[in-house]
Amino acid sequence: MQIYGDLRRLWEKAKIKESAKKPEITGLCRLIKGYKIMIKVLFICHGNICRSPMAEFIFKDMVNNRGLGDQFYIASAATSTEEIWNGIGNPVYPPAKRELAKHGISCEGKRAVQLKKSDYDKYDYLIGMEERNRRNMLRILGKDPEKKVSLLLDYADEHGDIADPWYTGNFDITYRDVVRGCEGFLTYLEGKGQIIMN
């Protein structure tokens, strides 16, 4: 996976203006010497059983429905180990799973995993749900020299935190906010010329 990020960074540094005008080259799903370059996104929350898996599967559904699935590698993780026992993560919290299912989205097989320092090099975007997540992400990752760390609603019209439905019980509101953030993130990527919208 690292080769994808390395090649993409080399490509961007080259800044070939003529090529940037060609849609088959502009999109992130380009071929450079036989390597397919994908944008790698990691969504992060406290336990990886509610908000971040909702974001993972909502965003997967969103890009797949737009025919963009092959341009992305998408996953999610936790800043804590509270939902991980003896190395095995808990599945998505049932109310979160039901909320996704209401919208025709499956999260089957997903289990909580913890964010690792090495994820900084593996992923292009590490996206938290609230300011506390960001602080804990930086505690695990260290510094953020490449400005990869952000919050999901940074990409939406209204910024702020996505409330934890574990405490609020409002999984419908969390779903709405995650969709809003994911749509904004996709628009942001399109604006940067990192993807080709079909």
Map each language-model feature to its residues.
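Conserved active-site segments centered on acidic
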Residues: 8-15, 32-122, 187-198
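Intrinsically disordered, low-complexity proline-rich regions
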Residues: 1-10, 26
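Phosphate-binding/catalytic loops
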Residues: 11, 20, 119, 125, ...
